């Protein structure tokens, strides 16, 4: 899902954190997070929820269902 990948990169860049930092916070390995950002893999529901909470946006925003972050 390309929009998810783009939004993850954008949000991480805005927050000025590394992929590794985000991965540790949401409880996944860095390689898995890289795959999310590369559009090679989509997170499961629990990880998607953790990412949305960490970036303080809705899961719908991450998935491209809305352009309103919250």
Which sequence ranges carry the predicted segments?
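Conserved hydrophobic/aromatic packing and binding residues within compact polymer-binding modules
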Residues: 8, 22-23, 33-36, 62
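DNA major-groove recognition helix of helix-turn-helix/homeodomain DNA-binding modules
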Residues: 27, 46-61
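Short basic helix-loop element that most often maps to the first helix and adjoining turn
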Residues: 6-25, 50
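DNA major-groove recognition helix of helix-turn-helix
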Residues: 37, 55, 66
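Short, basic-rich loop-to-helix N-cap that marks the start of a DNA-contacting helix
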Residues: 40-50, 69
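Recognition helix of helix-turn-helix/homeodomain-like DNA-binding domains
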Residues: 27-42
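Short amphipathic helical patch at the helix-1/turn junction of helix-turn-helix
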Residues: 2, 13-14, 42
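Short, charged recognition helix plus adjacent turn
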Residues: 61-70
